[in-house]
Amino acid sequence: MGHFEDYEHFLTELDRVWTECARVLVGGGRICCVVGDVCIPRKQGGRHYLVPLHSDIQVRARKLGLDCLTPILWHKIANGAMEAQGNGAGFYGKPYQPGGIIKNDIEHILFLRKGGEYRSAPMMQKALSMLTREEMQAWQRSIWTDLRGASTRSGHPAPYPVELAERLIKLFSFAGDTVLDPFAGTGSTSQAAIIAGRNSIANEIEPAYFEIAARSLRKVARRVRFTGAVEARLDVDRGRAMRSAAV
């Protein structure tokens, strides 16, 4: 989608994305959206305030006919410099004034479900998709505190760790399924799909991020592994799409 200054236009463009995702989803399939609310600093907006992006996405998704499910709050280390001017003391504001700023240390993992009954799978496919008791207990909690945010050294302003995508893929798909990522970024979702033994299709319009993702996926596809996809094939379309096939 690129960068938009107009927030309402940005939401309208997101509506187009959710509509297309819903079109290609299987019945009962889920859209997993990792999103942080937007903190506007005083220097930019004249006052510090928050734009509730996660709430707006949920409200508009309902109007598109998608079901909103219980989200997960992901507690991670935020980049304070992108929120407000800190004071070097680990907090914002002054201890003797009531105008302190709460750090935005969470992102929302939203789940939007397409209507219809979810399909059943053959016994072998179910066996390959089995989660452990420990994974079920940890991953189905509504707050995740054990995953650190991904480094921004790649140049992408909002990356997320491959492990986060791997959890979501394993929770909501069968082995051998195809996962679609309309915002590939640096390729975390497709890397996770290979590790989890799923196929993937990823789209990214920013050339710099696309090249980073392609390089990362080539490395992952070459690795020898004994779980997930024991072999992976990568097809890079210069029209800014990537496809990985798990074998």
Can you say where each PLM-predicted feature lies in the sequence?
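Core catalytic lobe of class I
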Residues: 1-212, 246-247
